[in-house]
Amino acid sequence: MKTLYSLRRFYHVETLFNGTLALAGRDQETTGFAWWAGNARLINLSGKLLGAHVAHAGLIVFWAGAMNLFEVAHFVPEKPMYEQGLILLPHLATLGWGVGPGGEVIDTFPYFVSGVLHLISSAVLGFGGIYHALLGPETLEESFPFFGYVWKDRNKMTTILGIHLILLGIGAFLLVFKALYFGGVYDTWAPGGGDVRKITNLTLSPSVIFGYLLKSPFGGEGWIVSVDDLEDIIGGHVWLGSICIFGGIWHILTKPFAWARRALVWSGEAYLSYSLGALSVFGFIACCFVWFNNTAYPSEFYGPTGPEASQAQAFTFLVRDQRLGANVGSAQGPTGLGKYLMRSPTGEVIFGGETMRFWDLRAPWLEPLRGPNGLDLSRLKKDIQPWQERRSAEYMTHAPLGSLNSVGGVATEINAVNYVSPRSWLATSHFVLGFFLFVGHLWHAGRARAAAAGFEKGIDRDLEPVLFMTPLN
């Protein structure tokens, strides 16, 4: 079989350049990579690489199913989800499964079904992974040319990219169909304190959807993280799904333009670096989304956001002191600013004290008390409902903060519950993983560019300890 590899060099890096695809073994002699380099041994063995990826998918889905069932087994319906260390059930609840008004869990059976379906799926994937890793063909190019590929074949690579985009688009539309036709999703903004509802009136206006992308990422604007109604979220998924599917069809039908052929590095390691870079961006965006957004991640399931807990504390003490006779409209705090209420630089009435930094918080329990110019003093005096007091006291004592210092006052809250919020878990894990993926992106991009330029020498392996050890087998 004619290969597309240059004969420029013979170093053990990135892709083999020794002009052969006949790599029978998966050992260091034939591949240039030792056993611990994992899938690097399989760079030119498309069948075995398929097995590794399918088996990896099986492990991922097995974790999802097992962890799902573990959370179901430990779940106490009387306690809020966020007090129980759950990270999967809140996602299922947000999709509208098993919950009723106010986010109360009324049926855990859908959660059980989800766990079992994932376990069964993981068994299928696990079998497929073992089959392709051990029994299937080493390479797919000869027997299944549709699934075969050569890393330098630009046209085939963009076809594979197109297939991936179409699958992502279908995934986006699955959420749309769930929201529109299959029972709806949980809306924290539903009147009366949140409920599952079908989304009927989608936002499809491009000026609204793409307007989010043009917003500043800073306070008061918040880029796409500022989305606060489900019509926009589901409408955004219609746009995103459509773009992914049409983009996928485009990439399948076309060949890369000349500028793209010149600008990009076309090797397996380069594609790995591009993917890691994209995943890194996704991780950082997800971190901000779960930390700040209480619409896509309802506080009923994930606990309050940091700003929400801080504003809830200010609200709780405003209610208390107002009952004790304080005039919350004019009371001065220790700094000379308003103790309970003050004005933002743009003139809105906002909560005073340390929580002033979170003046742009929007939350379902607080919005009914706002007027055209921020918080409405007459509503604060006459219209506060018991459910708002209960909700804010609950959120005040469940700040997602651990024991940081400058946190809008709530770290000193003596009634706080000692727990770790799922928001903290999800935000920190996605930030850390996003950072590691970024480092991996830089590493593999550097290696891929050097290999393409022809000056990558690799690590000098003459004195490598592993070469002096007896073989594992």
From Swiss-Prot:
Gene source species: Carica papaya
Residues where [CaMn4O5] cluster binds: E367
Main location: plastid
Membrane spanning residue stretches: 69-93, 134-155, 178-200, 255-275, 291-312, 447-471
Membrane topology classification: Multi-pass membrane protein
Gene: psbC
Function statement: One of the components of the core complex of photosystem II (PSII). It binds chlorophyll and helps catalyze the primary light-induced photochemical processes of PSII. PSII is a light-driven water:plastoquinone oxidoreductase, using light energy to abstract electrons from H(2)O, generating O(2) and a proton gradient subsequently used for ATP formation.
Name assigned to this protein: Photosystem II CP43 reaction center protein
Subcellular location: Plastid, Chloroplast thylakoid membrane
Family of this protein: Belongs to the PsbB/PsbC family. PsbC subfamily.
Cofactor descriptive note: Binds multiple chlorophylls and provides some of the ligands for the Ca-4Mn-5O cluster of the oxygen-evolving complex. It may also provide a ligand for a Cl- that is required for oxygen evolution. PSII binds additional chlorophylls, carotenoids and specific lipids.
